[in-house]
């Protein structure tokens, strides 16, 4: 998505929201025009939220520091699968140092979404060790059960632990036909090619509602498909088969 395309989208969505979340699937800090993208969002008065795997925090630190960003979510669990174990400590130290630097003006959510995965034990032990050291916390304090925003580590810094969930998969059959979801209730997603979908997990546009570049957002949200999906979730009913395969609703 180019900067001009992003600017066009911001103009289209601005009457509907004051919040923007720069993620669907992929790493937002990889965008070659990140600085300009953030400037456009900021100049339009949008509350900027970013979800990142944390691998580029050091490289992009100066860009992130110069902008007013409401919240940055750092998916620590991603490092377990994508970084060799001998580099976990360096990765975690960088992420925690970045969190401390940004915290005066930005909320930082450290995500550890793998709490039920037995294979993640050693990685999680390493994470909690680094966190207790960085924030001078005891193991007992770190093991407290929390909900919502998670455990407060310091001012504006939180640790959020959740089970790993299954992403929706159109090639699988699902039996969870009664569930609710945030889709179309408090958010939609717009993919890099302009396709509008109900939620941030539909990265392949399996439930395409429209195209932001050729249609008005108000018209897209009033399509029969969008209305049926939203009403379905309000009644805890799955309308789209792919939603029956999604595990995120178990976290709601």
Locate each region found by the language model.
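Short, small/polar residue-rich loop motifs at catalytic or cofactor-binding pockets
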Residues: 182-184
């Amino acid at each position: 998505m180019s900067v001009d395309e992003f600017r066009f989208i911001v103009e289209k969505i601005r009457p509907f929201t004051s919040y923007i979340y720069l993620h669907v699937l992929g790493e937002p800090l990889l965008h070659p025009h990140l600085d300009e993208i953030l400037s456009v969002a900021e100049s339009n008065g949008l509350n900027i939220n970013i979800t990142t795997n944390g691998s580029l925090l050091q490289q992009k630190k100066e860009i992130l520091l110069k902008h007013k960003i409401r919240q940055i979510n750092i998916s620590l669990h991603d490092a377990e699968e994508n970084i060799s174990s001998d580099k976990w400590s360096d990765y975690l130290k960088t992420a925690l140092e970045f969190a401390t630097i940004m915290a005066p003006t930005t909320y930082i959510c450290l995500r550890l979404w793998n709490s039920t995965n037995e294979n993640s034990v050693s990685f999680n032990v390493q994470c909690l060790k680094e966190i207790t050291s960085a924030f001078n916390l005891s193991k007992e304090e770190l093991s407290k059960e929390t909900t919502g925003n998670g455990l407060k580590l310091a001012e504006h810094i939180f640790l959020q632990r959740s089970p790993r969930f299954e992403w929706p998969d159109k090639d699988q059959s699902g039996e969870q036909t009664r569930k609710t979801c945030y889709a179309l209730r408090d958010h939609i997603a717009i993919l890099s090619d302009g396709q509008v979908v109900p939620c941030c997990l539909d990265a392949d546009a399996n439930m395409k509602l429209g195209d932001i570049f050729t249609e008005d957002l108000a018209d897209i949200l009033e399509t029969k498909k969008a209305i049926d999906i939203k009403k379905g979730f309000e009644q805890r009913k799955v309308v789209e088969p792919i939603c029956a395969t999604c595990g995120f609703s178990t976290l709601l």
